[in-house]
């Protein structure tokens, strides 16, 4: 593509669409459901920061989607912090799980806009397809056994703490000066 304008021009290189590899057709039966786009965005926004960058344990470099009849739980951990985001707003009514690579999660969360209403998700044991707006994003999942995050979080915790947000933020800023 040659783009010409008043003070010069730019030449962009491109590749014809038919030279890109086609999506592999799986022989497995694919699970398919639709969820609100804002639910996926909130789940990814709340978990992406805690994903591990250590490739020694590749399963920890992704976001674990734990899908149940009554909710979808997004989980990530870098082994120092564990984040669990549970959304019960519109459960798909099935039981499944997969680990989405963090790069794909960051791409999807950056592409979701307020105009996107729903995301259609279809997947098998190896890969997933996420369709919303004018985007079709295909990815291979990270394979392995994600650690049981439920064992780390106490079921019946008798302690409950409510703190003023501004007070807590101020204290964290002061302590941050002395942390490494």
What residue spans do the PLM features occupy?
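Structural preference for solvent-exposed beta-strand-turn elements
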Residues: 1-180
């Amino acid at each position: 593509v040659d783009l010409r304008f008043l003070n010069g021009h730019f030449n962009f290189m491109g590749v014809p669409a038919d030279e890109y590899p086609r999506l592999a057709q799986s022989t497995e039966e694919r699970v398919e459901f639709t969820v609100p786009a804002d639910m996926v965005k909130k789940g990814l926004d709340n978990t992406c920061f805690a994903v591990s960058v250590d490739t020694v344990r590749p399963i920890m470099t992704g976001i674990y989607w734990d899908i149940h009849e009554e909710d979808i739980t997004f989980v990530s951990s870098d082994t120092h912090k564990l984040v669990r985001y549970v959304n019960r707003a519109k459960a798909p009514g099935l039981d499944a799980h997969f680990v989405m690579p963090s790069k794909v999660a960051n791409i999807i969360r950056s592409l979701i806009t307020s105009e996107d209403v729903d995301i259609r998700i279809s997947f098998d044991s190896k890969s997933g397809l996420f369709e919303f707006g004018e985007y079709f994003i295909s990815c291979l999942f990270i394979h392995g056994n994600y650690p049981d995050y439920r064992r780390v979080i106490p079921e019946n915790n008798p302690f409950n703490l409510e703190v003023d947000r501004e007070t807590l933020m101020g204290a964290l800023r002061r302590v941050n000066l002395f942390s490494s």
